[in-house]
Amino acid sequence: MYDVVVAFPKMKVAVATHGGRVAAIRYLPPASALKAPANALAERAARQLERYREDPDARFDLPLAIEGSAFQKRVWEAMCAIARGRTRTYGELARELGGEARAVGQACGDNRLPIVIPCHRVVAADGVGGFAHATDGYLIEAKRWLLLHEAQADAFALRS
């Protein structure tokens, strides 16, 4: 199912490749097993994820399989425009894109390429908000870690 699984604080990050592209990135529970890269693209993705884990300014250069509705793609493009160390609310993106905050949240949750398409930078108006269609558990801890990693702790008084 996954071509590599990389260790991160609060989670494991799994990558699936297909047809020479990264098809999916998933957050797995922290106790999940690691997996060595199964192919050259998985190796490349693992190296770039590990570099990001150590340096939030690291950039990704991976061929991506991006599939979604026109609105989802607009949301994902807007997420990519959010600079590291910054956040936007679901409502702000909704107003910018001419949609509803709930639809933006749905597009964030449907993002199959998190970290590379940084849905963690989209937050609720009153705090962190959900993550990958979750409102608690390790996925929210993962979002908190990503925001802390990118220096957003002060803005949202995140607690570990």
Each predicted region: which residue ranges?
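Basic nucleic-acid-binding alpha-helical/helix-turn surface characteristic of O6-alkylguanine DNA
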Residues: M1-G99, E150-S160
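Acidic/polar active-site rim loop that often engages polyanionic ligands
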Residues: Y27-P29, A125-V128
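Residue-level detection of the helix-turn-helix DNA-binding "recognition helix"
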Residues: G109
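C-terminal flanking helix
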Residues: R112-L113
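Short Lys/Arg-enriched helix C-cap and helix-to-coil transition segments
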Residues: V116-A124
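…primarily DNA-binding HTH/wHTH and HhH modules…
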Residues: D126-S160
